[in-house]
């Protein structure tokens, strides 16, 4: 039995060495889910959702059990994934309340001078494609400049949405502007209503006789506030929820019927068109972010409502794309990677109060915070004949690692004019090294350094120190339900001095902070981590803030519409799909 095992190992190493030579390397299929929790997949312990096709990747490849997103929100995490750099380096981390782009006509986005893995691979002769969600900006100064468009960042083909999927994009899905509604609608209406009532009572009691025009102005102000909000919600969907093929809008607003099937079909078409040339396909699902949707054959079929239906439909789509690889004879020369952009959104509730977020398994917290539930994500890597199937890697890894891994396998040189924070995964996946190359990882909440993780090579521990943590609301819960997601500053957080210390190798639930009494090296560990944090911060160079209020605000001159409806307020029309 020993000789077959040794022969298989030798062949895998020879295949890897051949693939690492200059020239065309393997093909790449990179799959990213949106808001998927690590506890939502069978291969990570879920027993009530059916994910056989994703689980197949775990059986036929490597399962990363401590795979971490570089940020707990969509936009910054995706920027880090594409560039291999912490999002704060590219200005893709917010200093304010809003950490993502909500409007298609915002001027912020992934800066044109950033290098993505798609750009690198184009230089190596690869054909590159993006199917699905982008969420990294569209235009800068004019609607037609497309400075942030996927096509400007190395993708030869783009079919999907330049923004994201939101509740407001689907009729009946509710709205993400509930908290804003309280500030900008309910509060002003209450104040104006109180003023109107006070004037009426004063007039009735004979205490004062306010002029009639004051009544008129107050009523007009109430009508203006209410009307503006209704108009905003009415036009938000067509203005921000649409599909593009390359640089052309094909459907506005997005029709969710058959959407996942269409994305899977486009992915299959891309594979067939490029079967004879090296390719990179980034399949970026709109599942399982709200608004939830599923075709009739999946709707109502899971044990977890609309969320579970979306997970199972996405798994079906993964299976369709993997089957296409098999039919084309491309599976053995294609590295497949699957992940989520961050943890599940635990505060996400449906219009009727039902749970619409996923599961982060045993891990605390979720989307928008740096507890493990917000940043620990699925990580599956398959490459038949090269990566030994059925492995588990427990070392800390990052979604930023995809950038240098893909670059090296494709024979591309990494940029030398900037810091690359990701590390090549292949030595770890092949068993050439036993420890992660990430001795330290830095966890940001927007642009603020929230926590540091340390994996010392002379220990089995993984230390994690929090400089601040979110204030869950209501207290004792596992999220920030009053604000829909946790905030990163001000009264929304609690700062810790000394930092809150955990050993997540022994306490992955982050329930038992260590103290000098429970950990004799407590002070030494924190000093080492603080020194690493200061050294890291010293490498940061100031970058224009792409998520400033001026950059995330809606700009009418950047609004795109179908050619038949050129005015920004007349975008409510469907294309041919």
Curated annotation (Swiss-Prot):
Annotated residues for binding of Ca(2+): 34-35, 74, 341-342
Q: List the disulfide bonds.
A: 140-147, 169-241, 445-488, 480-486, 561-571
What PROSITE patterns does UniProt report for this protein, alphabetically? SULFATASE_1 (PS00523), SULFATASE_2 (PS00149)
Which reaction is this enzyme known to catalyze? dehydroepiandrosterone 3-sulfate + H2O = 3beta-hydroxyandrost-5-en-17-one + sulfate + H(+); estrone 3-sulfate + H2O = estrone + sulfate + H(+)
Entry's Gene3D superfamilies?
A: 3.30.1120.10, Alkaline Phosphatase, subunit A, Helix hairpin bin
> Which Gene Ontology terms describe the biological processes this protein takes part in?
female pregnancy; learning or memory; positive regulation of cell population proliferation; response to estrogen; response to peptide hormone; response to pH; skin development; steroid metabolic process
**Cofactor or coenzyme needed:** Ca(2+)
Coiled-coil regions, chain positions? none
Q: Recount the PTM note.
A: The conversion to 3-oxoalanine (also known as C-formylglycine, FGly), of a serine or cysteine residue in prokaryotes and of a cysteine residue in eukaryotes, is critical for catalytic activity.
How is the cofactor bound, as the UniProt entry phrases it?
Answer: Binds 1 Ca(2+) ion per subunit.
Q: Which residues form the signal peptide?
A: 1-19
| Residues of the active site | 74, 135
InterPro entries per UniProt: Alkaline_phosphatase_core_sf, Sulfatase, Sulfatase_CS, Sulfatase_N
Task: Tell me what topology the record assigns in the membrane.
Answer: Multi-pass membrane protein
**Positions glycosylated per UniProt:** 46, 332, 458
Task performed by this protein: Catalyzes the conversion of sulfated steroid precursors, such as dehydroepiandrosterone sulfate (DHEA-S) and estrone sulfate to the free steroid.
**PANTHER family named among the record's database cross-references:** ARYLSULFATASE FAMILY MEMBER, STERYL-SULFATASE
Name this protein carries in UniProt: Steryl-sulfatase
State the organism named in the record.
Rattus norvegicus (Rat)
Classification lineage: Eukaryota, Metazoa, Chordata, Craniata, Vertebrata
Q: Which gene encodes it?
A: Sts
């Amino acid at each position: 039995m020993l000789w077959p095992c040794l022969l298989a190992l030798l062949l895998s190493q020879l295949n890897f060495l051949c693939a690492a030579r200059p020239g065309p390397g393997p093909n790449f299929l990179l799959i990213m889910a949106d808001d998927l929790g690590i506890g939502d997949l069978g291969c990570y312990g879920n027993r009530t959702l059916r994910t056989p096709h994703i689980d197949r990747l775990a059986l036929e490849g490597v399962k990363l059990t401590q795979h971490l997103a570089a940020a707990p929100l969509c936009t910054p995490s995706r920027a880090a994934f594409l560039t291999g750099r912490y999002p704060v380096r590219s200005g893709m981390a917010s200093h304010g309340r809003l950490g993502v782009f909500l409007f298609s006509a915002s001027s912020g986005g992934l800066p044109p001078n950033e290098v993505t893995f798609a750009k690198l691979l184009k230089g190596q002769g690869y054909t590159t494609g993006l199917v699905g969600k982008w969420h990294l900006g569209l235009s800068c100064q004019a609607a037609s400049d497309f400075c942030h468009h996927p096509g400007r960042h190395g993708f030869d083909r783009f079919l999907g949405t330049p923004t994201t999927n939101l509740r407001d994009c689907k009729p009946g899905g509710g709205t993400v502007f509930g908290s804003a509604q309280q500030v900008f609608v309910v509060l002003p209406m209450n104040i104006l209503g109180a003023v109107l009532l006070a004037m009426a009572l004063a007039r009735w009691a004979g205490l004062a006789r306010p002029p009639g025009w004051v009544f008129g102005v107050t009523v007009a102000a109430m009508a203006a506030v209410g009307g503006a909000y209704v108009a905003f919600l009415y036009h938000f969907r067509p203005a921000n929820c649409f599909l593009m093929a390359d640089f052309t809008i094909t459907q506005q607003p997005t029709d969710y019927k058959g959407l996942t099937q269409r994305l899977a079909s486009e992915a299959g078409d891309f594979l067939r068109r490029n079967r004879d040339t090296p390719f990179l396909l980034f399949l970026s699902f709109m599942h399982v972010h709200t608004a939830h949707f599923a075709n009739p054959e999946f709707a109502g079929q899971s044990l977890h409502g609309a969320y579970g239906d979306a997970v199972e439909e996405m798994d079906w789509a993964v299976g369709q794309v993997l089957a296409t690889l098999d039919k084309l004879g491309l599976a053995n020369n294609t590295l497949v990677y699957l992940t989520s952009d961050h943890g599940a959104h635990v505060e996400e509730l449906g219009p009727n109060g039902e749970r619409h977020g996923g599961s982060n398994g045993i891990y605390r917290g979720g989307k928008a915070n740096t507890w493990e539930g917000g940043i620990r994500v699925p990580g599956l890597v398959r490459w038949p004949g090269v990566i030994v199937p059925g492995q588990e890697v427990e070392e800390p890894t990052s979604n930023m690692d995809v950038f240098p891994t893909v670059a090296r396998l494709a024979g591309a040189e990494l940029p030398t004019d900037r810091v690359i924070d990701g590390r090549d995964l292949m030595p770890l996946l092949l068993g050439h090294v036993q420890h992660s190359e990430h001795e330290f990882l830095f966890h940001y909440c927007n642009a603020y350094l929230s926590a540091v993780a340390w994996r010392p090579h002379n220990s089995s521990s993984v230390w994690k120190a929090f400089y601040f943590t979110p204030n869950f609301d209501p207290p004792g819960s596992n999220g920030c339900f009053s604000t829909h997601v946790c905030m990163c500053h001000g009264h929304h957080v609690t700062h810790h001095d000394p930092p809150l210390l955990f050993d997540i190798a022994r306490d992955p639930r982050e329930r038992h902070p260590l103290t000098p009494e429970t950990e004799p090296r407590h002070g030494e560990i924190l000093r080492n981590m603080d020194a690493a944090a200061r050294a890291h911060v010293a490498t940061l160079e100031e970058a224009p803030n792409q998520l400033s209020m001026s950059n995330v605000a809606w700009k009418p001159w950047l609004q795109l519409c179908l050619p038949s409806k050129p005015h920004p307020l007349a975008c409510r029309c469907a294309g041919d799909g």
